[in-house]
């Protein structure tokens, strides 16, 4: 077990299996020392636990927890390419999309769920640049989607 996975276990979390792609793409790809994940939905055991727009059917607090799940799924995608999460030199960037009701403006707080998980699991290596974007709708009516870019150390 990697140190990152041990830290996740301390947080009461287990790295899930990689979420299978919903269309014609890979969950993650490596280019040089970087791994780019596809957008990760908050899938748990193959299903979305909640659907709808944040600020309407989904509360900001629920969405923040879903963003945390997205980040956990993104780490699983990184591991599928890197082989070991301890190879992460740093998280470079996080991009979060929030399916938002027309008057919802709390996207940064929602995506904090992903950012806080990465910081808790990776320490200083988890500090990153970030975008949090409100959108009208996401695939499968998911409330949140998160993608990450990480830099790896040499094996």
Set out the residue ranges of the language-model regions:
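Short, polar/acidic, helix-capping and beta-turn segments at strand->helix junctions
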Residues: 1-155
């Amino acid at each position: 077990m990697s140190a990152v996975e041990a830290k996740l276990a301390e947080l009461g979390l287990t790295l899930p299996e990689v979420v299978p792609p919903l269309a014609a793409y890979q969950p993650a790809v490596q280019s040089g020392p970087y791994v780019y994940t596809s957008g990760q939905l908050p899938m748990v055991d193959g299903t979305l636990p909640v659907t709808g727009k944040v600020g309407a059917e989904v509360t900001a607090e629920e969405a923040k927890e879903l963003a945390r799940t997205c980040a956990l799924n993104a780490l699983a995608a990184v591991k599928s390419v890197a082989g070991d999460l301890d190879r992460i030199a740093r998280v470079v960037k996080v991009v979060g999309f929030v399916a938002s009701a027309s008057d919802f403006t709390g996207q940064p707080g929602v995506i904090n769920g992903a950012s806080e998980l990465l910081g808790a699991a990776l320490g200083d290596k988890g500090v990153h640049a970030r975008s949090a974007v409100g959108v009208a709708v996401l695939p499968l009516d998911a409330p949140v989607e998160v993608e990450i870019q990480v830099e790896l150390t040499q094996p």
